[in-house]
Regions:
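Accessory carbohydrate-recognition regions in carbohydrate-active enzymes
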Residues: 1-389
Length: 389
């Protein structure tokens, strides 16, 4: 979920983007939606022109920073697409496949075209290990390891450009540290594009496992550079998702509210596996699975009453994958999930809300998971002595 990111200022900014803002520090690739805790905001990119700059700036002063002011009048938003003409003159457009974001930047003429890769910034978390390396004239790889609401969060990425990279200057926070490669706590890099082509396309593929898996995700899901094709495919996928319920009303406002709420309902749980089935577990081990898709971001104490029963009606193909994901988490941490987030257990909120979700799926006849195993895990989690509630 690629989106504009402002300066994080507390609880209201848990998802990153906030409509009250007028400053953008870049476009990040992982986000929460509707939560009361903050995290993610990984792999921040910021296009700009002119001299090399890496600083974020502050809310009351971004002079000399890479950040930019913006106006909502210059924004366009739709499921699967985001567009913003920033005050710095760069127009950014974003779309995505399941595991690969595609950026299209249109630069103003007359000065160097830059792209900041900022691995320090997130959404209320703390990066502790980051890495960037220029692989060739078009490719950069890296990772961002962080701790926040999730106690363990690792994002590897491969970035490919359609325009040649003239240079990659690397920085430890804002201190220059040479070119092409750096590992540290707060690594940043500035791409300078070769030539003066007005438009640059940038692919960013992510993985919880490795840079190699991120590259494999990119090759599997996005082998071409046709931005509009990817955008249209994303729109078609959202239309397919939202068309599972149709309403008949003359009240256009009510219809917008209904489908906006339905859109929000489909944002989480989130897909958490590579195209080959690999994913990183809560125990930091890599698991390989080819029979079901692994998911994370389960706000179970919020969702066991209504969202998961709704999925059994309108997304039955989804249900067994979710249950198998919960059973896999038990194998990783010896209890069913409480509030799992992208490779870590937050243990947020009391209770063991996975149990009624699994029971509901079983009683409704879903057979895509091992029922005996599920029952054992449900009983064990119900008497887990260290669990709150």
């Amino acid at each position: 979920q690629t989106c504009a990111l402002p300066i994080f200022k507390g609880w209201d900014w848990c998802s990153g983007y906030h409509y009250s803002d007028s400053i953008i520090i870049g476009f990040s690739h992982t986000h929460l939606s509707g939560t009361g805790c903050s995290d993610l905001g990984d792999i921040l990119l910021m296009p700009y022109t002119g001299e090399v700059r890496t600083a974020r700036g502050e809310q009351d002063n971004i002079e000399g920073a890479a950040s930019s002011y913006y106006k909502h009048a210059n924004e366009a938003v739709a499921p699967g697409y985001y567009s913003l003409l920033m005050d710095n003159g760069v127009k950014a457009e974003l779309t995505a496949t399941e595991r690969v974001a595609l950026h299209r930047y249109t630069y103003p003429s007359g000065s160097e075209h830059r792209l900041l890769i900022n691995l320090k910034e997130g959404i209320g978390d703390k990066a502790y290990d980051t890495y960037l390396k220029k692989i060739d004239e078009y490719t950069i790889e890296g990772y961002r390891f962080s701790k926040g609401w999730s106690p363990r969060h690792k994002v590897f990425f491969t970035l490919k450009c359609d325009q040649p990279i003239e240079s990659l200057a690397v920085f430890n926070d804002d201190e220059a540290a040479g070119n092409d490669e750096l590992t540290g706590e707060s690594v940043k890099g500035v791409i300078t594009f070769k030539g003066d082509a007005p438009t640059a396309l940038v692919k960013v593929a992510i993985s919880s496992v490795s840079c190699e898996n991120a590259l494999a995700n990119l090759r599997t899901e996005l082998s071409h550079w046709d931005f509009d094709e990817v955008r249209n495919e994303a729109i078609d996928k959202w239309n397919d998702q939202l068309s599972c319920i149709s309403i008949d009303t003359k009240d256009e406002r009510a219809k917008k509210i209904f489908y906006t709420a339905m859109y929000h309902a489909f944002i989480a749980p989130t897909l958490y596996c590579d195209a080959n089935g690999d994913f990183r577990g809560h125990d930091d081990k890599v698991y390989t699975n080819n029979t079901w898709k692994n998911y994370s971001t389960f706000s179970l104490w919020d969702t066991y009453r209504t969202l998961h029963p709704l999925f059994t009606i309108i997304k039955p193909q989804y249900v067994s994958d979710l249950v198998n994901s919960m059973l896999s988490i038990y194998d990783q941490q010896e209890k069913l999930p409480i509030w799992p987030l992208i490779g870590g257990e937050t243990d947020q909120m009391p209770g063991y809300s996975a149990v009624p979700i699994i029971a509901d799926a079983y009683l409704k006849g879903f057979t895509g998971f091992d029922a005996d195993r599920a029952y054992r895990y449900m009983v064990a989690s119900s008497v887990y002595e260290k669990q709150n509630g």
